[in-house]
Amino acid sequence: MTQETDRGADFVKLVVLLIAALLLFAPFLFQDIRSLEVAARICVFIVLVASYDLLIGYTGIVSFAHTMFFGFGAYGAAIALRQMGPGWDAVLLGTLAGALVSLVMAIAIGLLSLRVKAIFFAMITLAAASVAMVLASQLSQFTGGEDGITYKTPDLFKTATKLVVTEDGKVARLFGVKLNGKLAAYYFVFASSLVLFVFMIRLVGSPIGTILKAIRENEARAEAIGYRVVAYRTFVFCVSAVIASLAGSVYAIWLKYTGPDTALSFSIMIDILLMVVIGGMGTMYGAVIGAVLMVLAQYYLRDLMGTAAEALANVPLLPFILNPDMWLFWLGVIFILLVYFFPKGIAGSLARKETEA
Amino acid sequence: MSLLTLNAMQTRIGQYAVLHDVTLEVPEGGVFVLLGRNGAGKTTTLRSVMGLWKPSPGSVSFRGTDLTGMHTADIARLGIAFVPEDMGIFGGLTVEENLVLATANGSFDTDSLARIWRLFPALEQFWTKAAWSLSGGQKQMLSVARAIIEPRELILIDEPTKGLAPSIIDAMAEAFREISVHTTLLLVEQNFEFARALGHQMAVIEDGRIAHTGSMADFAANKDLQASLLSLSA
Amino acid sequence: MDRFLTTIDRIGGVNLLPLAVALVAFFLIGVPSSWVTLTVAGLAMGMMIFLMASGLSLVFGLMDVLNFGHSAFVSFGAFVAASVLGWLAGWLGAESVVLNIAAIFLAFLAAIVFGLAAGWFFEAVIIKPVYHDHLRQILITVGALIVAEQMILAVWGGTPINVPRPNFLTGAVLLGDVAIEKYRVFAFLLGLVVYLALKFTLSRTRIGLLIRAGVENREMVEALGFRIDRLFVAVFMLGSALAALGGAMWAGYETLITPALGAEMMIVVFIVVIIGGLGSIEGTLLGAIMVGLVANYVGFLAPKLALASNMILMMAILLWRPNGLRPAVK
């Protein structure tokens, strides 16, 4: 039985390794700008969703403030780069500042609400996130309000930067790919994401991860054994917040633009929820699968829907169903069905199916 | 035929099996005492009968009716009342409202009300007070009163003497004796003196299994058995 | 100091909080006429928020179900009422007060009926399968909220909708130099009537007794022979209908509504329920009035802080009383 469970889990790991390999070679495999955009977004969202899974999957508490922490990191880096100019000092300072604000907020929210009731926590994080959103649009002299801010990142990441030059002074190519700053930026995103993700995998594999699982299985029992449940939950909440914040900084450096839509809006929160549920809660690897599927769907399926709707304009009902404006509606429906029928998500169900077979 | 029959009952809470094999016949009439150490499964047995936890596999039957899978409310309507360990008092409601809720149609039968006031005079005294303001003993009285405001066949009582003053325990024993004339009581008790004074039949539950069952008189006379099952020094 | 606190407790305890807030605001604002206007606005707003929040609080108290989709009922109520008022624009503009009242009555009735039906559907399809699983409950109700908001968007479109007010409720009454908007008085009174009716039901009827008992100890009510799940459906429907009514009244108050209304109100409703304490309608009323007053006073005194004021209020109260001002006895 255990052996077969392992086989299912191994299959999931294999898929995740494959995804990692595809992301590692993405610039060479898919040589267009849009694909690179997608690959970078996938990297960042894997970290973001995994850090959310740390919270929801390993402690069973639901936070709606995860985008807020992501936003702190993004705005931290963005504001520093805007105010101080495109230097590494700005990157470092902004990232740290964002992470620090996230940490402080997480501690405050955690201490205030985690000791009362898990359900309070969900409500309070929602309230906090909405205030953060309002503040971002009101403090427009710093945040650019609804328009957001654009800025320059360190020279290394400029598209015009030549990493390797040929003898005649042009950018060298490797397998047809220009070795320019854009490539450096992508690998910066990839490497940062990999480091953060591996850190989280190690964390859930450590004794702390075991304790978290014990708390998740039976809170009262864990408390009785002597684990300080509130302390552990607050700790995980803080770790998850800081990692989300770092992911936000990385994304801000990649995009060279930060605004409510890319870093703070509630729709990102919904995306995260969808990804973690689709992938499978409490598995870490599920985050990878969920993020890949959702980002691909956002970039390609939505367009496909639009094209299909136009093509089928004369067929009754279908254009309505395929209308890209209805995208969120269908996502919501799928989300509900998933939570009902596949609460373990893809990663969890795969491991299960192999066991049953 | 026995009033209540538990047949190879197993109950799990989450992933932990609390009851492994509880088989028990509770005869009609008198007080049946369920003894056992802390955590042996006494409370779980009562809650499983009441349908608050679902035993599976195994079955519970009451006068030949299979209770397994029935809703708690429907089990209660068969004439089974429950006095839980925490007494289950509605603190925000008055004493009167607590009792009104326990009646079948929302109005009191004069005789049973008079009986309750005679058994527990404090309840009449605090009739319109919020139940949270009662003392522990008075809350226990209210909880028992709720169980007997309507005629019942069987009352499940979980550790009624826990934390009560001796004088109140005496009053409680008196009340139980009177109630048990017409109603069968299934009593979970840690206080062996109290149990011995009241019980007719008894069983000891140990680690989720019935370890001994018989008459209270025999058990009370057998000090060795008591020592081995309850670790009582006396 | 202790003596002072006991005295306060005797004359009403935390119930005096709105009074204290109003008093402090009076001195900060300094202009009596502005203060009266703001206070009336705050009370009216509080009453409408109370309607929206009361169902959420009761449903949570009774079944430990926190419905994140609750604000969908508010939105639907607002849009349904707006549509009905739009169709009956002729009646609204008529000189006859009877026609005016008939129009607004029909609009509110439509919202309530919609709330009842939607509540029944929501409970059966969305909530029932996940009664005892908080995590999935939160996720599923959030999913339902997304779907509901998209439905509103699909039916009513994304552009703001004008909500006409009946003739007899437009304009203001002048009391000396104080102008009081008629609609605010109307909203306050209607809210008050609903509150009193709720209060009466809960304290004087058998079903109310069952609800109060169920909020405290669900298992015990079942052990006494009552099916809480059936009671819960009724409470859920009632709560949804009240939320829809609140939304309908809010639509008339704002006179211009957008599909974002639900999301905005959701935060406020949550804050109210947290402040007031879950499971008691007295607590919910107290929280709603506090939020209404503070929002209006701060909006006047320091407009920049207005949006954050609710949040600050919530934090302050949670630090003081982690379970809210008046939680149900548990």
Whereabouts are the PLM-identified features?
Chain B
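The feature captures the beta-strand-to-loop junction immediately N-terminal to the Walker
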Residues: 35-37
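Helix-to-loop junction immediately C-terminal to a conserved catalytic motif
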Residues: 50
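Conserved ABC transporter NBD signature motif
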Residues: 58-66, 78, 111-113, 118
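Conserved ABC ATPase signature
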Residues: 130-134
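ABC ATPase C-loop
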Residues: 147-148
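Helical segment within the ABC ATPase nucleotide-binding domain
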Residues: 169-182
